[in-house]
Amino acid sequence: MKRLVSFISILFASVALLSATEKGDTLKLMSYNLRFGELASMEQFAQYISSEQPDIVALQECDWATKRTRAPHQNGVRFVNELAYHTGMFGVYGKSINYAGGYYGIGLLSKYPILRFERVLLPNDGKTEQRSILVADIELPGGKVITFVNTHLEVKTAKMRIEQVEFIKEYLKDCPNQLFLAGDMNAIPDTKEMEMLREEWNDLTNRVFTYHSSRPEIKIDYIYTKPAENVELLCTEVKEDVKLSDHFPVISTIVSH
């Protein structure tokens, strides 16, 4: 009888494990341009992010110990480190440029361990601001590893954005993991550069405007994935009631199979 009970227990455990594997990993992904904290405090950002309980957050316009005249309340703040501390998440930072006595760049927060990360500089013509990508391998609870990429593309010229998109596609083409790409692309959906991304990447967001928060007129913030067949989109939303920045946060909840 004991052997029968043990066999049944093992059987149910196996079925449960198979079911969990079939369901995949449910992830809540966020992309948020912080506008270097000019319009809100670091504590307000931390409180908002914590309230959403995201699994991974891509952050753009992140200062590191700068001294800006436009944001004196943020002087000396190491944004990504402090957001990671106050939200209880892992955090990594990628410097794009030296600025105002510190650094300016992009960051990533993750509920799960970040196994590896790198900052990679994007093409630049020497006339525009240096941009970068932050590439992180993240281990999910079941042991699966995904690669999450955060970026903030050139704002002034479409030519540079096109070169940057081409670079990103080429740089990531041999990645063996499920890929996610999020950030402020500084381009609306129907531009050539966004069409180039959609040739290989699936857009996990809707077309609700993300900028400017005081008078929304355009969508420039996105979350993408590839290969598309491995990811199921459950819901996506632009948080139009959150006005801590000039951008709205973009959130997509997905299942990664």
Give the predicted meaning of each segment.
Residues 1-4:
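Positively charged n-region of N-terminal signal peptides that target proteins for export
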Residues 7-16:
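Bacterial N-terminal signal peptides
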Residues 9, 20-56, 90-93, 97-257:
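Active-site regions of metal-assisted phosphoester/phosphodiester hydrolases
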Residues 31, 58-67:
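Acidic/histidine-rich, surface-exposed loop or edge segments in extracytoplasmic proteins
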Residues 79-89, 109:
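Charged, glycine-enriched surface loops/patches
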